Amino acid sequence: MRLIVPLRGVIQGRGGLFVGSLIPCCLFYFLQLYLKRRRPPPSDPTDLPRTFSRTNLFSRGNSIGRVRVSSRAVPVAKPSDSPYYIGLERVKTDPYDRITNTDGIIQLGLAESTLCFDLLQRWMSENLMESMMQSDDGEFDISSIAMYKPFEGLLELRVAFADFMSRIMGGNVSFDPSNMVITAGGTPAIEVLAFCLADHGNAFLIPTPYYPGFDRDIKFRTGVELIPVHCRSSDNFTVTVSALEQALNQARKRGSKVSGILFSNPSNPVGNILSRETLCDILRFAQEKNIHVISDEIFAGSVYGDKEFVSMAEIAGSGEFDKTRVHIIYGLSKDLSIPGFRAGVIYSFHEDVVNAAKKLMRFSSVPVLVQRILISLLSDVRFIEGYMAAHRQRIRDKHIRFVEGLKQLGIPCAESGGGLYCWVDMSSLLTSYSEKGELELFEKLLTVAKINATPGTACYCIEPGWFRCCFTALADEDIPVIMERIRQLAESFRS
């Protein structure tokens, strides 16, 4: 009661202020003193485990489990089980070199060309710096490459691309730069088109065999599926309307919504060139079914046969069809042999597709410095005409040597007229005419013959024994080495 009275005095404002404030402080002090005396003495720090402190502090969270990434990233992070990527990775571990590693794996799985590097080397050495000089006085202007530029590509580059594409396609079609979006290679081009033309879970019809990279380019982020349209060697793997109809009906029965048709012309991996009639049939079919058409024409300038190349842009511009459903992919990786420049094109007659692609290019635009170089390169008409003539001739010559070498071994190839590869029939070397037999041969080629060739299984070919062999990065002296390795492997099967 004596303790409470002074406190009450404080509350009521009537005296006892000092005593009422002092008593609680004293009580708190004596309580601390009592607890301190009864506290056990501290342990010697040297008795503590050495591994305690930071290590133990962080290890306490281990029971929670490993931090997770998104469900989108998990399948992308996993190693691919496609023979196409398996072969490419194996070559990296033991690459062939005619001087330093003559027993290494020879790369026939990558469609790139070194045939005209001498011409590119000369042009770059003479024009590279000048192509970056943007001022009238010839001085370097940093603002021309350092400032923000349109994500869809500089207008000068789109104009140069339009002229270049028309030139390599025989001048039979003109391209409008306003329908064009510059991309960082063909991969972003196909992905952006898939994003624009199909919803997640929709599908594209795609004739087989097809380029294995399409699975990666389309499925990784867009969620769009690919439905194979099976073609056969009896038609030189050329797509037909009946095959498209059958694939579409089967897709609808499974509940899949088909949004378009995707194909390569010239075909990759076969190398055949689609005729004007076939292109009309495809577009007519798409119009009847109200779906889109995506024509990958990245090998348009790598045609070396007698057949005429016809762009789908020419068919769309004939006036017979609804051209807004036509979209074209192009790039410089193959025809100009500069995949490292990462330069591609989306060409579309659909205004919404072009506008959407322009905005999406903020994620994969081409560096301005590269664009400046390409403007000069593509605008050099004299160089381009000489280069393309040499490019086609050198592909033709290399193709003849490679196919003739296989022919002498009794190994035929499909008829082709474009691309940096040939479609080789190795079914005579199979231990069993099946997918399993083909994969066994793929492994033997890789480990015994030390040759990486892409098996048809990776391209969704339904006929076992076909392999894609890319030959435009080979030196002439490499071809006899390849043929000898295949010969020895074939003889080991017979013994």
Swiss-Prot record:
Tagged with keyword Transferase: yes
One Pfam family here: Aminotran_1_2
CDD domains: AAT_like (cd00609)
Tissue localization of expression: Expressed in roots. Expressed at low level in leaves, stems, flowers and siliques.
InterPro entries registered for this protein in UniProt: Aminotransferase_I/II_large (IPR004839), Ethylene_sulfur-biosynth (IPR050478), NHTrfase_class1_PyrdxlP-BS (IPR004838), PyrdxlP-dep_Trfase (IPR015424), PyrdxlP-dep_Trfase_major (IPR015421), PyrdxlP-dep_Trfase_small (IPR015422)
Molecular functions (GO terms): pyridoxal phosphate binding; transaminase activity
GO biological process: biosynthetic process
Requisite cofactors: pyridoxal 5'-phosphate
Enzyme Commission designation: 2.6.1.-
Conditions for induction: By indole-3-acetic acid (IAA) and cycloheximide (CHX).
Superkingdom of the source species: Eukaryota
Residues bearing the modification N6-(pyridoxal phosphate)lysine: 334
Keywords, in A-Z order: Aminotransferase, Pyridoxal phosphate, Transferase
Family: Belongs to the class-I pyridoxal-phosphate-dependent aminotransferase family.
Subunit description: Homodimer.
Function comment: Probable aminotransferase. Does not have 1-aminocyclopropane-1-carboxylate synthase (ACS) activity, suggesting that it is not involved in ethylene biosynthesis.
Protein name according to UniProt: Probable aminotransferase ACS12
Origin species: Arabidopsis thaliana
